[in-house]
């Protein structure tokens, strides 16, 4: 059986990864990166970009922000705003002049919204890039698997890397709850991957 991922190498964060990225991008300024990341409340939203930007040359990386908003203002909007402020600061500091956003409203029909998001991502012009980095740190599992599948299925002949920022001290406090224990929120679609409440945060994946 042929595995599509057999030629991929998985590296965890150690000095080897930092050295690899520095050597690979600093010595190959002709390489052009499109960096996809999710827009959300998760404090890890900008960790990956903050990690990558010092290792590439100015103008070597563009960004595509994936947003999956609700039509109503969420109670965690302040956290999203803080993340966006930091993201814009990174754009300015590292001269990321080309950055765009793909946005689909997930507050109504989840399956329809997911298909629409896949279509928008598939139509994005990846032609000028040699490397595609997908940062799934702030993207719900129910969404990022489809994004990865969509881009991989385009058979672009590009290097595609998947990055995730993990925080063990944060993740250890996440406990699985049976759906019967969840309190419904009027107007909130249970299948969507965003948080439904703060303190504690309930996330449907």
Annotate each PLM feature.
Residues 134:
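Residue(s) in the substrate-gating loop at a strand-loop-helix junction
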Residues 137-139:
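Aromatic- and glycine-enriched pocket-lining scaffold segments that form the walls
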Residues 1-131, 142-205:
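Long, low-complexity, Lys/Arg-enriched
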């Amino acid at each position: 059986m042929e595995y599509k991922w057999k030629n991929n190498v998985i590296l965890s964060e150690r000095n080897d990864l930092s050295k690899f990225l520095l050597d690979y991008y600093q010595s190959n300024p002709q390489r052009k990166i499109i960096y996809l990341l999710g827009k959300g409340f998760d404090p890890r939203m900008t960790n990956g970009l903050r990690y990558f930007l010092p290792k590439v040359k100015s103008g070597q990386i563009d960004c595509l922000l994936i947003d999956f908003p609700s039509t109503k203002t969420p109670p965690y909007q302040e956290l999203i705003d803080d993340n966006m402020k930091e993201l814009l600061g990174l754009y300015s500091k590292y001269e990321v002049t080309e950055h765009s956003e793909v946005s689909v409203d997930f507050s109504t029909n989840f399956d329809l919204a997911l298909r629409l998001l896949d279509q928008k991502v598939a139509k994005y012009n990846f032609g000028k890039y040699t490397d595609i980095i997908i940062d799934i740190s702030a993207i719900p599992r129910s969404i990022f698997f489809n994004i990865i599948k969509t881009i991989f299925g385009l058979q672009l002949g590009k290097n595609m890397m998947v990055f995730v920022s993990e925080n063990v001290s944060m993740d250890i406090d996440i406990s699985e709850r049976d759906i019967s224990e969840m309190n419904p929120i009027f107007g909130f679609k249970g299948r969507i991957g965003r948080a439904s409440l703060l303190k504690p945060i309930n996330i449907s994946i």
